Amino acid sequence: MSTIEERVKIIISEQLGVKKEEVVNTASFVDDLGADSLDTVELVMALEEEFNTEIPDEEAEKITTVQAAIDFIQSSR
């Protein structure tokens, strides 16, 4: 089974239509990966579905980088 980090990166790559190599831990969804506000909402929904968790809106607003997404999912396990 893939690690949480690998799974998060795959979801980000697929949702934002970017190459997996571009999805580095320090990458910002908006500044580095070209996401807009709708992309980030869809990304949060995809993460919720993949990891069977709920991400409250106030937490979702803080998830702006690849590492922030990984950290949130790991802390919710």
Swiss-Prot record:
Changes after translation: 4'-phosphopantetheine is transferred from CoA to a specific serine of apo-ACP by AcpS. This modification is essential for activity because fatty acids are bound in thioester linkage to the sulfhydryl of the prosthetic group.
GO molecular-function terms, A-Z: acyl binding; acyl carrier activity
Keyword Lipid biosynthesis attributed: yes
Keywords, in A-Z order: Cytoplasm, Fatty acid biosynthesis, Fatty acid metabolism, Lipid biosynthesis, Lipid metabolism, Phosphopantetheine, Phosphoprotein
Domain Carrier: 2-77
Gene Ontology annotations of biological process type: lipid A biosynthetic process
Pathway recorded for this protein: Lipid metabolism; fatty acid biosynthesis
Gene Ontology cellular component terms for the protein in this record: cytosol; membrane
Localisation per UniProt entry: Cytoplasm
Coiled-coil segments on the chain, per record: none
Residue(s) carrying O-(pantetheine 4'-phosphoryl)serine: 37
Family membership noted in the UniProt record: Belongs to the acyl carrier protein (ACP) family.
Function (record text): Carrier of the growing fatty acid chain in fatty acid biosynthesis.
Protein name (Swiss-Prot/TrEMBL): Acyl carrier protein
Organism: Baumannia cicadellinicola subsp. Homalodisca coagulata
